Amino acid sequence: MRKIKFFDTTLRDGEQSAGVNLNLQEKLEIARQLERLQVDIIEAGFPASSKGDFEAVKQIAETVRTCSVTGLSRSVRSDIDAAWEALKGGAEPRLHLFIATSPIHMVHKLRMTPEQVIEAAVEAVKYAKRFFPIVQWSAEDACRSELPFLAKIVTEVIKAGASVINIPDTVGYITPKEYGEIFLYLRNNVPNIENISLSAHCHDDLGMAVINSLSAIEHGATQVECTINGIGERAGNAALEEIAVALHIRKDYYQVETRLNLQEIKRTSNLVSKLTGMVVPPNKAVVGKNAFAHESGIHQDGVLKEKTTYEIISPELVGVSSNSMVLGKHSGRHALRNRVEELGYTLSEEEINQLFVRFKELADKKKDVTDDDLIALIFEEKFDHFKDFYQLSSIQVQYGTNQIPTAVVVLKDGKGNTIQEAATGAGSVEALYNTLERCFQTAVTLLDYRIESVGGGRDALAQVFVKVRVNDVETSGRGTAQDVLEASAKAYINAMNRMFMIEAMRAENEKVTTP
């Protein structure tokens, strides 16, 4: 049975989603979880693009041991050199080279002739092979390329040493039948193609990324590039979880196998959703909240009698467990640590101690602390602290049906200075955000504001997600608290702290690149 490799590009292509800005710690946590999921390859970033990306790729390569870590590179020596410096400490360093091959890209973007593009691609592969044992080569915009030219350049880069050939549907333009035919054409017209791996990379602009990827597998691809939850530029990329479960459930049809640990899918999906701020739609296949919900009476009756009447995927297959433990105010540190580990999270001793304090505070306010509550606290403790920037000290909001809503906010900056401001607004949240804007002394555009409950009940935690824009930079933030307004303030501050982190990284990059 053929084996299909999963190439996860959540940390590179996925992070290019509008408003997604992951810090180093968040990228490392996602990489560790992808390793638990047992993807074959993690594309950790684009090392030559910035100092921050370089450092993230380097640390991920040095941390992950059971997956191959790769980085993206243009067909230029300086990019390849940067990628090698970042990836050489990995367990199995590999490089992902690309150059555009469609007429529109060659003429308008590269301004190169087809012969010059072939020469650049071959030279880059040969140079990369001096360092990397595995070189993957991608034909950017392959699906709008002329097939004879595509076959010609693929032939030449294979001769130069490329061992993986990736055929991206860069703009999400192709149909399943056409995409499969490209793979058949290459298999029939490229010498020695049986000695290399063919890879698929699909975007979802026309809603066909997953089915196109499956078509590629049917027509000879042995690797698929995808992202968790299908995040990515524009309409996103092919969703890893959908391809993986389709191959598993329909193994009778596809006749392939993977090394993925499918029980880690739901946990991975939740992690990526929380850290990116991109909420998974309830009706999302495989990982959506409603994926295993049956509302129709006929369906409910059938499932109660025999699950397989209407449930082709068992929740347990992807790690959705009904085994939820409830902790309370009498639960100790040992019980907390055990449950954290059972939920699949790794925390340091210091993080456990800090989490225990927050857990006790919540347990005093709530009768029961559920797994959802605990996960929310873990995220807040592990990822939402930016000690060098701003932290919330207190908020006070005054509201009445016949009064003008007013907010008072007290913040502390990284140097311990106290900042206090007050402002009004049309509603409580607007008053709060107007006050915070005064605290930061920066014009901020609020692009999105979403709130959801963590678990059920009147005492449930509130989780708020925001997306903001300052000048040309968009970023997201999240906040958790029992009070909606406190959660709203935390989310806004979290987004602004990320903004200041991005600005600091930009300033550092300018120092590095300035002669």
From Swiss-Prot:
UniProt function note:
Catalyzes the condensation of the acetyl group of acetyl-CoA with 3-methyl-2-oxobutanoate (2-ketoisovalerate) to form 3-carboxy-3-hydroxy-4-methylpentanoate (2-isopropylmalate).
- Pfam families cross-referenced by the UniProt entry: HCS_D2, HMGL-like, LeuA_dimer
Q: What is the lineage of its organism?
A: Bacteria, Bacillati, Bacillota, Bacilli, Bacillales
As for subcellular location, the record says: Cytoplasm
Q: Which organism is it from?
A: Geobacillus thermodenitrificans (strain NG80-2)
Q: What GO molecular-function term can you cite, just one?
A: acetyl-CoA C-acetyltransferase activity
- Stored SUPFAM superfamilies: 2-isopropylmalate synthase LeuA, allosteric (dimerisation) domain, Aldolase
What name has this protein been given in UniProt?
2-isopropylmalate synthase
Q: In which pathway does it act?
A: Amino-acid biosynthesis; L-leucine biosynthesis; L-leucine from 3-methyl-2-oxobutanoate: step 1/4
One GO cellular component assignment for this chain's record is:
cytoplasm
